[in-house]
């Protein structure tokens, strides 16, 4: 007779084994993103009677925030070169902060109108959770094509910061919806400034303390453990202080990935930390996409209607992204550094959705006693539809688009 903990551990071992097998098959057979196959396999196997229910995994919406998000965000921030980031800070900030807010309004407004649910917190919540981008596969194409470094920094930097902005906006809207206190623009702006500013200061502070410790060590395994502790500790402490854990992790990751990498880490330590977090990134991404497949089984009876809503969501996602990208790019070229016009098409089409929207979808709470309970199944299916379309349609056509525009060497 298995104990509950043995049963849960066995389930996760099986899921990780499945993730590895699916990833190997996807690499050998096709160039489609392995995450798509993981989701489809997760959805497919969930209908077999021997496959455990999603609830048996011990999975809960809080697990996503406190276990999955910190290392995923830290890994992205650790690899970001601060000097290059600062060179393009204004376009990155414009795309990532006002851009995400405008995209949330446009996407939410469109799906509220076309999807027939009206304009309110539900469509805005969806607009916020689908706004963060995840250009991992696009950046791989950039490396293969030897694309301009400045273009890579623009795309990667925007993704890093719009992940943070999207999560903060999502959290503010979710609390307004669940708490029932209503929504005001002024209050939301103040809350945004408070949680972002507080998260940044806290992340910088704990990151600096970690740097001081790392500078006195020369043990790569211990230093790697400190980086992992920093990712989770910064997130947990920020959330306990009611500021943004996402911003805190990004700030700490940027500090350690630049200042710490240069002044406190040996080459062996850097290699250890990079390899470790890349492995964690793969494992957590794999689990996320299998879990969304298992989660969709819970709502298999509503899979017919929401696909109509998903079509509206995909259109809204693309329209919102297009308006923000082309408008902001045009304005920035008028008042600042001139960048090639062809880049705006890459920035628009390269805004793939991936692990962060999936994590936010899975973070939607159950049994809130609000209107969210009625719309959660629809949001899950529509969100999955957006991510699926993004990874398949956009991810597989990036290389031909770059070839057509004469960017890089493809």
Each PLM stretch: what is its role?
Residues 1-410:
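Transmembrane helical cores of multi-pass secondary ion antiporters/exchangers
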């Amino acid at each position: 007779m298995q104990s509950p903990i043995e049963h849960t551990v066995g389930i996760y071992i099986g899921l990780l084994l499945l993730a590895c097998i699916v990833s190997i098959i996807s690499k050998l057979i096709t160039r489609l993103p392995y995450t798509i196959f993981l989701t489809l396999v997760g959805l497919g196997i969930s209908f077999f009677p021997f496959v455990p229910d999603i609830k048996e995994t011990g999975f809960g919406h809080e697990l996503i925030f406190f276990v999955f998000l910190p290392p995923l965000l830290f890994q992205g921030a650790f690899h970001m070169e601060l000097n290059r980031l600062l060179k393009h800070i204004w376009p990155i900030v414009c795309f990532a902060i006002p851009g995400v807010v405008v995209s949330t309004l446009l996407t939410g407004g469109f799906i509220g109108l076309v999807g027939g649910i009206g304009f309110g917190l539900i469509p805005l919540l969806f607009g916020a959770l689908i706004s963060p981008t995840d250009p991992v596969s696009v950046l791989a194409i950039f490396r293969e094509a030897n694309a301009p470094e400045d273009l890579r920094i623009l795309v990667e930097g925007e993704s890093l910061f719009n992940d943070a902005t999207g999560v903060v906006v999502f959290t503010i809207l979710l609390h307004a919806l669940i708490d029932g206190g209503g929504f005001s623009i002024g209050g939301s702006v103040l809350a945004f400034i408070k949680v972002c500013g507080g998260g940044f200061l806290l992340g910088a502070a704990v990151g600096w303390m970690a740097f001081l410790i790392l500078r006195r060590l020369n043990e790569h395994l211990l230093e790697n453990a400190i980086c992992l502790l920093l990712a989770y500790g910064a997130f947990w402490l920020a959330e306990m202080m009611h500021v943004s854990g996402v911003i805190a992790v990004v700030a700490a990751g940027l500090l350690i990935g630049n200042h710490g990498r240069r002044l406190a880490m040996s080459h062996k330590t850097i290699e250890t930390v990079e390899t470790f977090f890349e492995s964690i990134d793969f494992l957590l991404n794999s689990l996320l996409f299998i879990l969304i497949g298992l989660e969709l089984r819970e709502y298999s009876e509503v899979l017919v209607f929401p696909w109509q809503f998903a079509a509206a969501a995909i259109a809204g996602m693309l329209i919102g992204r297009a308006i923000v990208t082309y408008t902001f790019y045009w304005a920035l070229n008028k008042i600042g550094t001139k960048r090639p016009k062809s880049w705006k098409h890459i920035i628009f089409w390269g805004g793939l959705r991936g692990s962060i929207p999936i994590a936010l979808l899975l973070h939607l709470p159950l049994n809130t006693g609000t209107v969210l309970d009625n719309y959660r199944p629809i949001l899950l299916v529509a969100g999955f539809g957006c991510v699926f379309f993004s990874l398949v349609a956009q991810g597989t056509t990036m290389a031909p688009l770059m070839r057509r525009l004469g960017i890089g060497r493809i």
